[in-house]
Amino acid sequence: MAAQASEDLKKLDLNGQAGDSKAAAATAGQAEAGEAEDDSDDDEVDGNAAPEGAASGAAKKKKKRKPKKKKKGGAKVQSSPPRVPISQLFPNNQYPEGEIVEYKNENSYRTTNEEKRYLDRMNNDFLQEYRQGAEVHRQVRQYAQKNIKPGQTLTEIAEGIEDAVRALTGHQGLEEGDNLKGGMGFPCGLSINHCAAHYTPNAGNKMVLQQGDVMKVDFGAHLNGRIVDSAFTMAFDPVYDPLLEAVKDATNTGIREAGIDVRMSDIGAAIQETMESYEVEINGQMHPVKCIRNLNGHNIDQHVIHGGKSVPIVKGGDQTKMEEGEVFAIETFGSTGKGYVREDMETSHYALVPNATPVPLRLSSAKNLLNVINKNFGTLPFCRRYLDRLGQDKYLLGLNNLVSSGIVQDYPPLCDIKGSYTAQFEHTIVLRPTVKEVISRGDDY
C-alpha cells in the first residue's frame, strides 16, 4: 500500500508448497510397503512352526496378527480458486522462508555472530506469522495473475482476491474481532493507468478492465496484525513491458540497498538512478520513466500499515536510518507523466488514526460507526465495501464526520496527469538480526 511523502503522512501455478503430490505418493507407498512387511513377518513366524502331525505333538504356534497400520491420506493441495487455509497445507505451522539476503560491508558479521543468531531464534513466532501471510499472498496473487482478464469488472477482481485471502488465512472477518486476528491487511487496490494508488471500487462501481489498461494490484494479508504488503502491475499489451521492467528493477534495487543502519536517502538515490535509466515508446513517442517523487515505501508496525518511517524513491532528503528488527514495504512507482500524484476521484480507503485525540461526537451515526470500526478493523485500513459487508448502511454522513474530526483518515486515489501510465512493484522485507528476509518474494516477482 502506497505511502505519500512525509508531509502527507502527517494527517495468487500454485506450487502447493504444503506438500508435493509426489511426496504424498511416496509416503503412501511406504505405508503400503510397511503393511506388506508386516504380513511377510507373520508368514515367517508361521513357517517356523512345527509341521502338522509332528511326532513331538508340539502344539501349533498361533499366528499373531500385527495391527495394520492406517494408510496416511494424501497431502492436501490448494484448490482453484484458492480456498484451502494455509494452516491446513502446513500442519506443523512451519512456513516457507522468503528470500534470504546476507548483509554486506560492515554488517556482514551479523550472519555468523552468535548473539545475533540467538536473537534471530527468539523471533520465530513473529517470523512464522509473517511467513504464513506471505504464503497466502503468493498463492492468491499467482491465481490472480493467471485469471485476471480484460472484460472483468474491478469489483469482480477485487472481491475474488479478497475472498481468497480471507479463506486462506481462515478468517472471514464477519464475526466481531475476527478481522483483527487475520485476513485482509488493507483493501485490494486496483489502480488503472494514470491512477497510481489507493483505488478500489465502491459499491455499484461498473468499471471494466480493458485490453489497453495498466493495472496496479496492491493488497495485503495479515495474521495477528503482521501485514504482508506486496504489489505488482498487470498489462496486456507488450508495449508497456519496459515501464513494468523499470519499476520492477527499481524495487529490486531498493531491496538490495536496504539494510540495518542504511540511510533512507541513499536507498532513494539508488532507486531513482535505476528507474530513470529506462524509457518506453507508446504510440511512436518515447517517454522517460520517472519516479513518482511524492510516493514512498514505508515501515510496517503491528496492525499499522504506515508505521511512520518513509523510504523515498528519489535522492535527497531523509537521513533517517533503518534499524534492526524493523519491517519495511519497499515499493516504487514509475510514470510516463509528470512523476507527481494528486488526490483525485472518489475516496474508498480509510483507516483509524492511531492514538487520535479524543473528540466529542454529536452524531449518533458517527459514534455507532466508530464502535464498528474499532471492533472490526482497529487501525487496519478498510474500505466502504467492507462496511457494506458487515451490514452497515447509511453510514456516509457518520464516516465523513469521523474524517472531519480527525479520528479517521481518508486516503483518496492518487493520480498523475490523465493520459499517462503508472506502474508499481512492492515487497515486504524484515531486517532480521542476522539476515535480510524478503518475506513476500515469489517465483513471479
Curated annotation (Swiss-Prot):
SUPFAM superfamilies of this UniProt entry?
A: Creatinase/aminopeptidase, Winged helix' DNA-binding domain
**Compositional bias of type Low complexity: which residue ranges?**
18-33, 47-58
The EC code for this enzyme is: 3.4.11.18
Q: Where in the cell is it found?
A: Cytoplasm
Which InterPro entries does this one have? Creatinase/aminopeptidase-like (IPR036005), Met_Aminopeptidase_Type2 (IPR050247), Pept_M24 (IPR000994), Pept_M24_MAP (IPR001714), Pept_M24A_MAP2 (IPR002468), Pept_M24A_MAP2_BS (IPR018349), WH-like_DNA-bd_sf (IPR036388), WH_DNA-bd_sf (IPR036390)
Q: Its GO biological process terms?
A: proteolysis
One cellular component term from this protein's GO annotations in UniProt: cytoplasm
- PROSITE patterns given in the database record: MAP_2
Compositional bias (Acidic residues) at which positions? 34-46
Basic residues compositional bias: what residue ranges? 59-74
Predominant location: cytoplasm
> Any idea which UniProt keywords this protein has?
Aminopeptidase, Cytoplasm, Hydrolase, Metal-binding, Protease
Query: Which residues does substrate bind?
Result: 198, 306
- Residues the entry annotates as binding a divalent metal cation 1: 218, 229, 426
Q: Which residues bind a divalent metal cation 2?
A: 229, 298, 331, 426
Q: How is the cofactor bound?
A: Binds 2 divalent metal cations per subunit. Has a high-affinity and a low affinity metal-binding site. The true nature of the physiological cofactor is under debate. The enzyme is active with cobalt, zinc, manganese or divalent iron ions. Most likely, methionine aminopeptidases function as mononuclear Fe(2+)-metalloproteases under physiological conditions, and the catalytically relevant metal-binding site has been assigned to the histidine-containing high-affinity site.
Instruction: Provide the GO MF annotations for this entry.
Output: initiator methionyl aminopeptidase activity; metal ion binding; metalloaminopeptidase activity
The record lists the catalysed reaction(s) as: Release of N-terminal amino acids, preferentially methionine, from peptides and arylamides
* Region Disordered, residue ranges: 1-92
* Cofactor dependency: Co(2+); Zn(2+); Mn(2+); Fe(2+)
Family, per entry: Belongs to the peptidase M24A family. Methionine aminopeptidase eukaryotic type 2 subfamily.
Please describe what this protein does: Cotranslationally removes the N-terminal methionine from nascent proteins. The N-terminal methionine is often cleaved when the second residue in the primary sequence is small and uncharged (Met-Ala-, Cys, Gly, Pro, Ser, Thr, or Val).
Q: What is this protein called?
A: Methionine aminopeptidase 2-2
Q: Which species is listed as the source?
A: Aspergillus terreus (strain NIH 2624 / FGSC A1156)
State the taxonomy lineage. Answer: Eukaryota, Fungi, Dikarya, Ascomycota, Pezizomycotina
